[in-house]
């Protein structure tokens, strides 16, 4: 194993009461590498990703990004993000508010949040006037692009 892989997991264990969902997982992902996690339902794929983005805490082991531990860093400060299978958008909010949400958590100024949201609308080929459109009024494909824009908003180092 290289000394400073992009992402390294050392001895990751995740337990839920008496149930061990992940048992001593070691993994190394290099810069620029694409990595796929496959397995049957209930095998721990989602649990692993939830640990990587900080939605759950590891029971044991460590997660390192470029050699620095991130498993004790709060989720809103980690340089990782995920697009949920269900998209997990806020239907009562506008497209712009959804995209800006992770930036608001990071205390980015309103002007900078708006500028980044508009930049991402352009990148993902959604009309700029969608900024004020309710997510509930978007098509399924448009919602997927909004979820991707939200995940890219703070320019994460790793996207799941």
Q: Which residues are covered by each model-predicted region?
A:
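Conserved ABC ATPase "signature" region
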Residues: 69, 111-129
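Helix-to-loop junction immediately C-terminal to a conserved catalytic motif
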Residues: 53
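Hydrophobic anchor residue at the start of the ABC signature
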Residues: 148
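Short helical segment in ABC ATPase nucleotide-binding domains corresponding to the A-loop/adjacent helical element
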Residues: 96-104, 114, 118
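The feature captures the beta-strand-to-loop junction immediately N-terminal to the Walker
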Residues: 38-40
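Conserved catalytic motifs of ABC-family nucleotide-binding domains
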Residues: 155
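Conserved ABC ATPase signature
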Residues: 134-138, 142
């Amino acid at each position: 194993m290289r000394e400073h892989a992009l992402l390294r997991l050392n001895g990751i264990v995740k337990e839920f009461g008496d149930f061990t969902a992940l048992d001593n997982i070691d993994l190394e992902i290099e810069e620029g590498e694409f990595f796929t996690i496959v397995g049957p339902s209930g095998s721990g794929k989602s649990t692993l990703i939830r640990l990587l983005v900080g939605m759950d805490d590891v029971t044991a082991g460590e997660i390192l990004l470029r050699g620095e531990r991130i498993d004790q860093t709060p989720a809103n400060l980690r340089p990782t993000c995920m697009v949920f299978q269900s998209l997990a958008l806020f239907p009562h909010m506008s497209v712009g508010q959804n995209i800006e949400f992770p930036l608001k958590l990071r205390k980015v100024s309103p002007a900078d949040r708006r500028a980044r949201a508009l930049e991402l609308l352009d990148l993902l080929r959604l009309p700029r006037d969608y900024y004020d459109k309710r997510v509930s009024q978007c098509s399924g494909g448009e919602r997927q692009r909004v979820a991707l824009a939200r995940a890219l908003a703070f320019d994460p180092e790793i996207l799941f």
